[in-house]
């Protein structure tokens, strides 16, 4: 078993133990700093959840386990919000390596499909976007939702999405404080 496979198995076990609704299926290694990130699925909803720890260069197993354990309630809150509000949506939470964007680079919009369901987005300005993105750099996350009809849009950001912002901010704050960054 390679070192990458050993790390993947060890950290996957810790994450899945902490968050039973998360299953991990991929591992990424940053060749420059030797740190890892893991990607998997949130069960019961369409979407993906990535606990990306590259930004913090976490290599100590005990520290990693402490962070996962201490932030369990925050991630559960995020899961509850997504499950309640976005069960019919396709949601992806990722950390794209190539994208480091400040909040002021984004525009806000709500897209409605023919049934009246809301597809909430915060997206970078694309010329012809059928897939629009919500991205916040709180623990490096992005949420993308496919808009069924992007001709219908509103400039208002609903309160429930602000709840998700708050969870990201809290998770970022907790990890930052834990690592004394």
Where are these regions (language model features)?
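Negatively charged, low-complexity tracts enriched in Asp/Glu with abundant Ser/Thr
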Residues: 1-26, 60-126, 152
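Short acidic DE-rich linear segments
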Residues: 2-3, 176-181
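Residue-level signal for functionally critical sites in structured catalytic/ligand-binding pockets
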Residues: 3, 32, 155
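Short edge beta-strands and adjacent turn/loop segments
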Residues: 25-43
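Short beta-strand micro-motifs in enzyme catalytic cores
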Residues: 34-38, 99, 141
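Intrinsically disordered, low-complexity regulatory segments enriched in Ser/Thr/Pro
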Residues: 44-70, 76, 106-166
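Flexible loop/turn and low-complexity linker elements, especially glycine-anchored beta turns
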Residues: 167-171, 176-177
């Amino acid at each position: 078993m390679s070192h990458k496979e050993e790390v993947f198995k060890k950290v996957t076990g810790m994450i899945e133990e902490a968050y039973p609704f998360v299953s991990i299926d991929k591992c990424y290694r940053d060749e420059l700093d030797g740190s890892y990130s893991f990607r998997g699925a949130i069960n019961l909803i369409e979407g993906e959840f990535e606990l990306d720890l590259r930004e913090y260069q976490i290599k100590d197993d005990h520290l990693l386990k402490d962070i996962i354990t201490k932030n369990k309630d925050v991630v559960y809150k995020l899961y509850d919000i997504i499950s309640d509000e976005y069960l019919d949506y396709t949601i992806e939470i990722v950390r794209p390596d190539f994208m480091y964007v400040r909040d002021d680079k984004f525009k806000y919009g709500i897209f409605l499909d023919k049934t009246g369901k809301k597809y909430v987005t915060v997206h970078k300005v694309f010329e012809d976007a059928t897939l629009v993105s919500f991205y916040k750099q709180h623990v490096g996350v992005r949420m993308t939702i496919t808009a069924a009809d992007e001709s219908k849009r509103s400039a208002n950001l609903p309160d429930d999405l602000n709840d998700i912002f708050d969870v990201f901010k809290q998770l970022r704050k907790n990890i930052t404080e834990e690592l004394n960054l």
